[in-house]
Amino acid sequence: MGLEEQLPGGILLSTVEKVAGYVRKNSLWPATFGLACCAIEMMATAGPRFDIARFGMERFSATPRQADLMIVAGRVSQKMAPVLRQIYDQMAEPKWVLAMGVCASSGGMFNNYAIVQGVDHVVPVDIYLPGCPPRPEMLLHAILKLHEKIQEMPLGVNRERAIAEAEEAAMLARPTIEMRGLLR
């Protein structure tokens, strides 16, 4: 006999972290950072065929101060990188970043000095979405994966500890250029 059998109907048992995670995951407001062809697929996701509003993303935010998810869609040039970082810094906590497309994830086919070889060199990335360009269905799937991640994110001191551990693990990772085995 557990506690669940002793409670009357209509009682829900949970933790504050689980309830806060549920609320946060169902009210994401994305700030779009469309830089190339991936932005067209991102705009298609907001249309009636894919209906991103059913996942709590009623509108795309035009200002970073009202957004908590940044979708970086397309290649990021070296000149655009400081602007991307400034927009990320203006977003309120908690905030998440989704790198949409192979150009945002790893520089794509643009292996030259003018393109950032992965947006994770500028801002911390939570979800990487492959493809050139990825289909709207893939973006919806990535957002649902991000919902799962947000649901499990701890609060308060536990959140700060989890973020510090993730940053430390990211600093220990090999640079992207070494992992891809690029020609030099």
From Swiss-Prot:
[4Fe-4S] cluster binds at C37, C38, C103, C132. GO terms for biological process: aerobic respiration; electron transport coupled proton transport. Its cofactor is [4Fe-4S] cluster. It is found in: Cell membrane. One of its GO terms (cellular component) is plasma membrane. Keywords: 4Fe-4S, Cell membrane, Iron, Iron-sulfur, Membrane, Metal-binding, NAD, Quinone, Translocase, Transport. It is an enzyme of class 7 (translocase). Binds 1 [4Fe-4S] cluster. NDH-1 is composed of 14 different subunits. Subunits NuoB, C, D, E, F, and G constitute the peripheral sector of the complex. NDH-1 shuttles electrons from NADH, via FMN and iron-sulfur (Fe-S) centers, to quinones in the respiratory chain. The immediate electron acceptor for the enzyme in this species is believed to be a menaquinone. Couples the redox reaction to proton translocation (for every two electrons transferred, four hydrogen ions are translocated across the cytoplasmic membrane), and thus conserves the redox energy in a proton gradient. This is NADH-quinone oxidoreductase subunit B. It comes from Mycobacterium marinum (strain ATCC BAA-535 / M).
